[in-house]
């Protein structure tokens, strides 16, 4: 058999193995198909990217519930109007769960749905201290509530009780909503969007300041109930325009690495549950596409940490015109599809060759550069001494020991 034939056989065998690295397309690209006959899905599916039937935003592969789509989510809007009670302590949780049950069964009609379910609640945070900027209103309203009941208490006691009541209520709301979703659609994995956060927005010319600070680690551990109840973790590593203009490439690598490693750390609270980071192809608040090398590197970083995949999110805002749809189509064809194909191929190759197909490869001594191995389209050589395996149902450096 000549070398070309051997290469073809190797490729076919590897591709026959079910990909351990899954990329979900969460973009309403049906708008391009219906309005302008620009079909992005054919390119995506031919490169094993998971797309909902009919190119819908919510469907058989992935669903996302925004704040107004799931139950009676309490929040305070931009005009200071209190919606559904405004703050958690006075909102009706039972009514919320009753409505949420109908929402879930309607949006996810298949009781055997086995995709990814995402809850996107962003108006407030369960950690009291992280409700800053616009979210400070929740702390103020919580303090006012305690003050109205106990006007004689000193301010420090009022704030301590307000914090305790807020965090207790947040836990109850988030856990019971997750449990409901898991009971109704038990074959799916469920997560809250953008949890955990790392709040690593400083700009320094070394890795450590871009890592999660100790305060964040401590507070993320305090909400261990969230990681224990979740069956997936879905942090956001969206590339921002400010990252491109203010950060060097090395700093962008460090920023993403810190956020991913915090997700990995917290996943251990619940038997190493799968991690699906949210990534983007359009810079938020702009019409600019993510630079090609940044997109490639981001996907490579996710895979090089042994994670299960990624969710590629996009808004209908960028699909209203024919020119916008053409930009999306070209980026999918020339950047997203070939990058995903290469990363999936190399992830599977390394898994089969080094981890016996029982886990994914990690390069612990090369935390900021190992992504390059998985972006190499020329069948890179994987050196076992540089690799440890993130194993599924096995133990040992190379997943050689059954649990």
Curated annotation (Swiss-Prot):
InterPro entries: Aldolase_TIM, Glycoside_hydrolase_SF, Hyaluronidase. Disulfide bonds join 32-325, 191-234, 198-212, 350-361, 355-389, 391-399. It catalyses: Random hydrolysis of (1->4)-linkages between N-acetyl-beta-D-glucosamine and D-glucuronate residues in hyaluronate. Residues 1-19 form the signal peptide. Glycans are attached at residues 39, 103, 200. GO terms for cellular component: extracellular region. The active site is at residue 122. One of its GO terms (biological process) is carbohydrate metabolic process. Keywords: Disulfide bond, EGF-like domain, Glycoprotein, Glycosidase, Hydrolase, Secreted, Signal. It is found in: Secreted. Residues 346-400 form the EGF-like domain. GO terms for molecular function: hyalurononglucosaminidase activity. It comes from the Eukaryota. It is an enzyme of class 3 (hydrolase). Expressed by the venom gland. Its EC number is 3.2.1.35. Belongs to the glycosyl hydrolase 56 family. Hydrolyzes high molecular weight hyaluronic acid to produce small oligosaccharides. Is an important component of the venom, since anti-hyaluronidase serum effectively neutralizes the lethal effet of the venom injected into mice. It may act by increasing the diffusion of other venom proteins by degrading the extracellular matrix. This is Hyaluronidase 2.
